[in-house]
Amino acid sequence: MIEKNVVILRIETGNPSGVVRYIQMLTEGMKHMNGIKVHIICLNTSLIFPKFEVTEDRIIANIPYPSKSKPLRNEIYWLTKYFNVVSDLISPYFKNRKQLIWHVQELLLVKLADILKLSLGGHILTHLHIIPWKLSLEYNESLFKKQYSQWLNNTFNLINENQLEKIAYPLSDRIICVSYSAMKHIISAYGIHPDKISVIYNGMDDTGITLQERKSRTPEILFVGRISREKGVICLLNALNKVASRGYFCKLKLVGQCTGYMSSHIRKAYKQLKIDILGTVSFNELKELYTTNTIGVIPSLHEQCSYVAIEMSMFGMPMIVSDVDALSEMFEDEVNALRIPLVFDEDFGLELD
């Protein structure tokens, strides 16, 4: 039997993310699969020189990636030039490998996968971890409001202007989505045939997880994720303000990456609330938080198949989640979570109800 060689293409920025978690789960799981070898091509934003680790079973290539370079960020021509250089560096290590599967974790890298495919053969498998147009909520809210308004009316002339998506989906031999909402996006906005798409939810190994009794008298609410508006943190804080004004008090723990500006804003604007901003913590510390806090909250304004949601569920946390995207698929209201609807106004934007 000819061995398959799965080559994961990813970008490393040093920040924790669902993509990083997925790759950890995938590589660990693949160790137990016969006939499959897993390799990694990583474009690393912190490197100056390329670094290769080569064994008989595995190739790990770390390539410098100047992500802040304006030509690479703004022009497909220069990005393609860069990818050609990366291909020239990498190709000698894979020239004798057969049954290559270029497993792309970022839409940006599909063009690199296509260059490698033309040189070395194989197939391109694109893994869609996000719905790209919804990211505009974070960097261009005015655009997001227009896109969301059109999406509600099943029109896509603003949504389908994403150049990366226009390039990536036709070049992909197969596309994996982590939710049916993402699959619907690809079909509706870009006309990709459903037969080309598979939906595979994220998953985790639950070995070694022990459920514990929660003993805290004061309700302790746990949020895990990037501490930002799009993750619903401001909506959560506003809701807790209303609860406090009615004489009910709880403690909120915010775990995850947080900018200095956001941290300062939270401490000033919500100083009447009991809030601990813990920053990024290890998974062992997360386990402790999952088992000792009263309620897990995922108030995201958009969300795919969240590993935090999976982890909280595995540890038996009572949960409140926003009724959006993959969270709507993962949780049944008043069965395994309380689902909070979203409301949209063209002037005020998207909020939790």
Where are these regions (language model features)?
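Aromatic "clamp/platform" in nucleotide-sugar-dependent glycosyltransferases that forms part
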Residues: 301
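Carbohydrate-associated surface elements
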Residues: 181, 203
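Nucleotide-activated donor-binding/catalytic signature segment of Leloir-type glycosyltransferases, i.e.
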Residues: 263-284
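Short His-centered aromatic/hydrophobic patch
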Residues: 104-109, 128
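Membrane-proximal helix-turn-helix segments that form the acceptor-binding/catalytic region
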Residues: 132, 148-175
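A conserved mid-protein helix/loop that constitutes part of the nucleotide-sugar donor-binding site
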Residues: 21-28, 219, 223-242
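Glycosyltransferase donor-sugar binding loop
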Residues: 224, 251-264, 279
